[in-house]
Protein backbone atom coordinates (compact mmCIF):
# COMPACT_ATOMS: atom_id res chain seq x y z
CA UNK A 1 0.00 0.00 0.00
CA UNK A 2 1.62 3.29 -1.07
CA UNK A 3 1.55 6.00 1.58
CA UNK A 4 2.17 9.68 0.92
CA UNK A 5 2.46 11.91 3.98
CA UNK A 6 2.49 15.63 3.30
CA UNK A 7 3.48 18.06 6.03
CA UNK A 8 3.42 21.75 5.17
CA UNK A 9 3.77 25.00 7.03
CA UNK A 10 0.88 26.61 5.14
CA UNK A 11 -2.86 26.13 5.47
CA UNK A 12 -4.49 24.04 2.74
CA UNK A 13 -7.98 25.42 2.13
CA UNK A 14 -9.34 22.70 -0.16
CA UNK A 15 -8.06 19.70 1.78
CA UNK A 16 -10.35 17.08 0.20
CA UNK A 17 -9.43 18.12 -3.33
CA UNK A 18 -5.73 18.21 -2.47
CA UNK A 19 -5.91 14.72 -0.92
CA UNK A 20 -7.75 13.35 -3.95
CA UNK A 21 -5.21 14.87 -6.36
CA UNK A 22 -2.33 13.45 -4.31
CA UNK A 23 -3.94 10.01 -4.33
CA UNK A 24 -4.26 10.11 -8.11
CA UNK A 25 -0.61 11.15 -8.46
CA UNK A 26 0.60 8.31 -6.20
CA UNK A 27 -1.48 5.80 -8.13
CA UNK A 28 0.05 7.01 -11.38
CA UNK A 29 3.63 7.04 -10.07
CA UNK A 30 3.43 3.57 -8.52
CA UNK A 31 1.20 1.94 -11.14
CA UNK A 32 -1.02 0.73 -8.29
CA UNK A 33 -4.76 1.03 -7.99
CA UNK A 34 -5.92 4.14 -6.19
CA UNK A 35 -8.00 1.95 -3.87
CA UNK A 36 -4.74 0.91 -2.16
CA UNK A 37 -3.29 4.43 -1.82
CA UNK A 38 -3.26 6.33 1.48
CA UNK A 39 -2.53 10.05 1.72
CA UNK A 40 -2.09 11.96 4.98
CA UNK A 41 -2.01 15.74 5.29
CA UNK A 42 -0.58 17.81 8.10
CA UNK A 43 -0.99 21.48 7.30
CA UNK A 44 -0.08 24.53 9.35
CA UNK A 45 2.87 22.62 10.82
CA UNK A 46 5.54 25.03 12.08
CA UNK A 47 8.70 24.20 10.13
CA UNK A 48 12.23 25.54 10.13
CA UNK A 49 14.02 24.62 6.88
CA UNK A 50 17.09 26.13 5.21
CA UNK A 51 17.55 28.60 8.05
CA UNK A 52 14.08 30.15 7.99
CA UNK A 53 10.36 29.55 8.40
CA UNK A 54 9.24 30.45 4.87
CA UNK A 55 6.51 28.22 3.41
CA UNK A 56 7.87 24.71 2.99
CA UNK A 57 6.76 21.12 2.57
CA UNK A 58 8.05 17.75 3.76
CA UNK A 59 6.92 14.65 1.84
CA UNK A 60 7.36 11.11 3.13
CA UNK A 61 6.65 8.58 0.36
CA UNK A 62 6.51 4.90 1.33
CA UNK A 63 5.66 1.94 -0.84
CA UNK A 64 6.33 -1.76 -1.06
CA UNK A 65 7.90 -2.38 -4.42
CA UNK A 66 9.88 -0.15 -6.66
CA UNK A 67 10.16 3.55 -6.05
CA UNK A 68 12.35 5.56 -8.37
CA UNK A 69 13.31 8.68 -6.39
CA UNK A 70 15.36 10.26 -9.18
CA UNK A 71 12.38 10.17 -11.55
CA UNK A 72 9.62 10.76 -9.01
CA UNK A 73 11.19 13.70 -7.14
CA UNK A 74 10.80 16.14 -10.01
CA UNK A 75 7.20 15.16 -10.75
CA UNK A 76 6.19 15.31 -7.08
CA UNK A 77 7.91 18.67 -6.56
CA UNK A 78 6.24 20.22 -9.60
CA UNK A 79 2.88 18.79 -8.51
CA UNK A 80 3.19 20.21 -4.96
CA UNK A 81 4.37 23.58 -6.24
CA UNK A 82 1.44 23.80 -8.67
CA UNK A 83 -1.13 22.56 -6.13
CA UNK A 84 -0.22 24.65 -3.08
CA UNK A 85 2.35 27.20 -4.24
CA UNK A 86 5.39 25.99 -2.32
CA UNK A 87 8.59 26.80 -4.25
CA UNK A 88 10.37 23.66 -5.48
CA UNK A 89 13.52 24.54 -3.51
CA UNK A 90 11.42 24.49 -0.31
CA UNK A 91 10.19 20.90 -0.78
CA UNK A 92 12.00 18.00 0.90
CA UNK A 93 11.11 14.44 -0.12
CA UNK A 94 12.02 11.23 1.69
CA UNK A 95 11.48 7.87 -0.05
CA UNK A 96 11.20 4.55 1.80
Where are the regions a protein language model picked out?
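Interaction-mediating elements
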Residues: 1-96
